[in-house]
From Swiss-Prot:
Any single GO CC term annotated in Swiss-Prot or TrEMBL for this entry: plasma membrane
Membrane topology classification: Peripheral membrane protein
Entry's EC annotation: 2.4.1.227
UniProt KW Cell inner membrane keyword: yes
Family note: Belongs to the glycosyltransferase 28 family. MurG subfamily.
Source organism: Burkholderia cenocepacia (strain HI2424)
Name listed for the protein in its UniProt record: UDP-N-acetylglucosamine--N-acetylmuramyl-(pentapeptide) pyrophosphoryl-undecaprenol N-acetylglucosamine transferase
Keyword line: Cell cycle, Cell division, Cell inner membrane, Cell membrane, Cell shape, Cell wall biogenesis/degradation, Glycosyltransferase, Membrane, Peptidoglycan synthesis, Transferase
Matching InterPro entries: GlcNAc_MurG (IPR006009), Glyco_trans_28_C (IPR007235), GlycoTrans_28_N (IPR004276)
Taxon lineage: Bacteria, Pseudomonadati, Pseudomonadota, Betaproteobacteria, Burkholderiales
Length: 367
């Protein structure tokens, strides 16, 4: 670190929905010459993932209360005080010019201590319904940013920071116009899989006449790939050229760009990535998400005719097959164009610029 080098502290943890957008901003700031240090929980996924990106870490031990027992709730005051003390120690060691909170329970004690120590705090909320931590910290932050309009009052709509390769794909009209033949459908269950999609999609395809069937790439999640193969075999399909089953997809930008339609859950980052690429989507929100935020995430696009939203309780093989029969590449291309129009592909740069400005830095360094 040079005497003139500025420092960003990113605080985020718990899930990929918090960590991955934080990493996108971290790399953007590093590219502009900033030093970045990450504040996370030693028990969280960030403790393994972030160091692989070459970013040094500070640790705070603090967890949530949802679904926890009486003992955890009774010890909350002690644990919170300890986490605040650990956060203050990290702030004193790192001496950041600005702190960016991307969500997760550890951001609460660290955010409070950031504000009390007089350092500028910038918050970013990834979901359409703000979590409790960000609702409280928003009152202490210098700038509040949201991925979906209206998630927090008086916030700036920047979109979700995403990987650069997702933000710079070919426009939908060019991609769709270059294709012919059966529709290309990508089914994404996420890293953990989505049992409802893994069960319904094969049965829906079996209800379609051979000439109506799309080409399918179905990502199942590592733990679910064998069960998915069994589901397709039971529906009369053998994995081959028109049905490709995979446990994981390394290059999501290429997978999205090759698809005419994506069938998936509606986590915040998934919705943001699909909009950035510009691809038609049928969202089936995870019904047990906190505050049902996946439904409102999907509704942001669905209400604009940029996607279709089907609740899991309503999803059936018959419904999906009937809907697929009514789609054409042209209708899906129209949906993709509407989706792209609602995207914020420059969100990573915008969040980085806000952080720089909060620190009193020259924005030209982020051009």
């Amino acid at each position: 670190m040079t005497a003139s080098q500025r420092t960003l502290m990113v605080m985020a943890g718990g899930t990929g929905g918090h960590v991955f957008p934080g990493l996108a901003v971290a790399h953007r700031m590093e590219a502009a010459g900033w030093r970045v240090v990450w504040l996370g929980n030693p028990a969280g996924m960030e403790a393994t993932l972030v160091p692989k990106h070459g970013i040094p870490m500070e640790y705070v031990r603090f967890g949530g209360l949802r679904g926890k027992g009486l003992k955890t709730k009774l010890t909350l005051p002690v644990n919170l005080l300890r986490a605040c003390w650990q956060s203050l120690g990290a702030l004193r060691r790192v001496r950041p010019d600005v702190v960016l909170g991307m969500g997760g329970y550890i951001t609460f004690p660290a955010g409070v201590m950031t504000a009390l120590s007089g350092r500028p705090l910038v918050l970013h909320e990834q979901n359409s319904i703000a979590g409790l931590t960000n609702k409280v910290l928003a009152k202490l932050a210098k700038r509040v940013l949201v991925a979906f309009p209206g998630a927090l009052p008086h916030a700036e709509w920047t979109g979700n920071p995403i990987r650069a390769e997702l933000a710079h794909t070919e426009p939908p009209h060019a991609r769709y116009a270059s294709r012919s033949g059966p529709l290309n459908v990508l089914v994404v269950g996420g890293s953990l899989g989505a049992a409802a999609l893994n069960e319904v999609v094969p049965r829906a395809l079996a209800l379609l006449a051979p000439g109506e069937r799309p080409r399918v790439v179905h990502q199942a999640g590592v733990k679910h790939i064998e069960a998915l193969k069994a589901n397709y075999e039971a529906a009369g399909f053998a994995a081959g050229e028109d049905v490709r089953l995979v446990p994981f997809i390394d290059d999501m930008a290429a997978a999205y760009a090759a698809a005419d339609l994506v069938i998936c859950r509606s986590g915040a980052m998934t919705v943001s990535e699909i909009a950035a690429v510009g691809v038609a989507a049928l969202f089936v929100p995870f019904p047990y998400a906190v505050d049902d935020h996946q439904t409102t995430n999907a509704a942001f696009l669905a209400e604009a005719g940029a996607a279709v939203l089907v609740q899991q309780r309503d999803l059936s093989a018959e419904l999906l097959a009937d809907w697929l029969r009514g789609q054409s590449r042209a209708s899906l291309a129209d949906m993709a164009e509407r989706s792209r129009a609602l995207a914020k592909p420059e969100a990573t740069d915008e969040v980085a610029r806000v952080c720089a400005k909060a620190a009193g830095a020259n924005l030209e360094t982020l051009q």
